[in-house]
Structures are given as C-alpha cells and as structure tokens.
Amino acid sequence: MLILSRKKNESIHIGDNIIITVVDIGGDNIKIGIDAPKNVQIFRSELLKAVEQENKNAVSSKSVIQDLAQLIKGDEKKQT
C-alpha cells in the first residue's frame, strides 16, 4: 500500500484519468473528491462489506435454500 500525505486542495493522480483531491479536513473526517471516468466504479468499502454480508446471510438462510430446492424440483417435474 502506498501512503501519501496531502494537504487541503492537494491532489493525487492515478493513471491518466483519475484524480483524487483532498477537499476538506475537519476533526476526524477528511472529505475527498474523486474525478474519474464514468466507467470506473467507486464504492465505499463499508458499503461493499455490508452488501457482501447480506448476500452471505441470504444464501445461508435455510428457507432460501429450501425455496430453491422446491423450485428446482418443480422445474424437473415440468420437464418430464
């Protein structure tokens, strides 16, 4: 991991088309601005972790697995 120090209004360039700028510093918070092409996806890591956990919970739920098994059995009956 590369660690850089930046002051307010200073930027970091990543590649040819991504610019990260320190917009504001206050207390424990730092506001950053990200200028990137629309095809570059930018997500907050805590949101990705929450979605990942919800997906794991949904898949591990017995009722979901039972529902899927019923759907598969129903499809097999229709095909025979």
Swiss-Prot record:
Biological processes annotated in GO: bacterial-type flagellum organization; mRNA catabolic process; negative regulation of translational initiation; regulation of bacterial-type flagellum assembly; regulation of carbohydrate metabolic process
Annotated compartments: Cytoplasm
One MF annotation (Gene Ontology) recorded for this entry: mRNA 5'-UTR binding
InterPro entries per the UniProt record, alphabetical: CsrA, CsrA_sf
Cellular component aspect of the GO annotation: cytosol
Record Pfam families: CsrA (PF02599)
Coiled coil, from the record: none
Domain of life: Bacteria
Keyword vocabulary terms for this entry: Bacterial flagellum biogenesis, Cytoplasm, Repressor, RNA-binding, Translation regulation
Subunit structure and binding partners: Homodimer; the beta-strands of each monomer intercalate to form a hydrophobic core, while the alpha-helices form wings that extend away from the core.
NCBIfam families xref list: csrA (TIGR00202), PRK01712.1 (NF002469)
Job of this protein: A translational regulator that binds mRNA to regulate translation initiation and/or mRNA stability. Usually binds in the 5'-UTR at or near the Shine-Dalgarno sequence preventing ribosome-binding, thus repressing translation. Its main target seems to be the major flagellin gene, while its function is anatagonized by FliW.
Family of this protein: Belongs to the CsrA/RsmA family.
Xref: PANTHER family: CARBON STORAGE REGULATOR
Protein name: Translational regulator CsrA
GN (gene name): csrA
